Amino acid sequence: MTFTEETRAVVDAYYQAGAEGHLPSFGTYLDERFSVTAPNYLPWGGTHVGADFFREQVLEHLTETLDFSRFSYESFTVERTHAVALINIGVVGTDDIIKISEHWEVRDGKAKSIWVAYFEPQPLLKLLAIVVSGN
């Protein structure tokens, strides 16, 4: 398997685990020094190093806010150990779909990091009861 194929398989396993209703099972793909960086305004935001944080705070709870049954790829680009998934995903309890750009690094069959950016996240912020100034 090439680096690109391996990276594609690991990253796709995350989204498929969510879509199939067993997101926590993705924890087996995490390197123990896995790092996640997400916008600070989210409960799971900031930069966190260590697979335990992602397993306990993200994999165990993300489906409380994001509806993976309404997941789709806008685009999925992989080159060697780097993947960028631009996804559409539902916001739980609403008809809203938001767009998220997720940038992954994978090596030796393990996810090493994810960096996440949300586009127009107002429906998610409303669900989380986070007040946003502006429009």
Predicted regions mapped to residue ranges:
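C-terminal and inter-domain tail/linker signature
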Residues: M1-N135
